[in-house]
A protein has these predicted regions:
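Non-transmembrane alpha-helical segments in soluble domains
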Residues: 66, 84-87, 172-173, 194, ...
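A short alpha-helix/helix-coil micro-patch that ends at or immediately precedes a cysteine
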Residues: 64-72
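Surface-exposed patches in mature extracellular/periplasmic domains of secreted proteins
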Residues: 71-83, 96-100, 182-194
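Peptidoglycan-targeting cell-wall enzymes and recognition modules
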Residues: 26-60, 64, 83-174
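Low-complexity, Gly/Ser/Thr/Pro-rich intrinsically disordered linker/tail segments
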Residues: 12, 21, 196-221
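Acidic helix/loop microenvironments that form the catalytic cleft of cell-wall polysaccharide enzymes
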Residues: 87-90, 185-204
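Proteins synthesized as precursors that undergo proteolytic processing into mature forms
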Residues: 167-169, 178-185
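N-terminal secretory targeting signals
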Residues: 1-32
Length: 221
């Protein structure tokens, strides 16, 4: 009898979790504005070019954020806060959608440990497939799989992931969903979110501060 009771309780618990999951997936999306992004970002004094880039970028990506947030169920304030905080740091406060790696991307080249993990197999793959988009899609494998998901070619011209704001956001949302980052965001686990997005903990303290700013903008704190 106890075993049956435990099984029934476990079944009920699973049904409740499924119902809660459906409830989260079907929630009205969080509305993102350019002002929110501007306030989440830090700004550069006496660097007009970067300020202009920030201003252009935050306005360019807002409609696409709201579109893809709906598709990929970033529809709670907490999920949105984590996504925006990570995007803010990855893009140097929304100033650039292209990574500036320490060695120009050669550290990702075929034959290196990182390069092998990223699926870089040809000479020049490291610089060619540096991080681009809001969450810095990196490596031949990721560009290939992203293109396959949407029946597009991002291998011939990978710079499209950074040059086109729509694609920059779409790539980030694709990677967020691929890595199941919503689960860590729901737990408010900044360490796990950072690991899933970054592959390490680069800029962790900066990401924590960006998360605080994002939570304030979204009314969480």
């Amino acid at each position: 009898m106890k075993t049956k009771a435990k099984m029934a309780a476990k079944c009920l618990s699973s049904l409740v979790k499924m119902a809660m999951g459906d409830k989260i997936r079907n929630r009205q999306m969080v509305d993102i504005t350019a002002d929110m992004l501007w306030n989440i970002a830090r700004h550069y004094r006496h660097k007009e070019t970067l300020l202009n880039s920030q201003y252009y970028n935050v306005h360019a990506i807002v409609p696409h954020l709201n579109q893809w947030f709906t598709v990929y169920a970033i529809n709670t304030e907490l999920r949105a806060a984590h996504f925006l905080a990570q995007a803010c740091v990855e893009t140097a406060n929304f100033s650039s959608f292209t990574e500036v790696p320490r060695d120009g991307g050669r550290e990702y080249d075929a034959g290196t440990r990182i390069g092998r993990n990223l699926g870089n197999t040809e000479v020049g793959d490291g610089p060619k497939f540096i991080g681009r988009g809001l969450l810095h899609l990196t490596g031949r494998d990721n560009y290939t799989n992203f293109g396959s998901e949407f029946d597009k070619d991002y291998i011939t011209d990978p710079t499209m992931v950074a040059r086109n704001p729509y694609v920059a956001v779409k790539a980030a949302r694709y990677y967020w969903d691929l890595r199941h980052v919503n689960t860590a965001a729901d737990r408010d686990d900044i360490n796990k979110v950072t690991l899933l997005v970054n592959g390490g903990y680069n800029g962790l303290e900066e990401r924590k501060m960006a998360l605080i700013r994002a939570k304030r903008e979204l009314g969480i704190i």
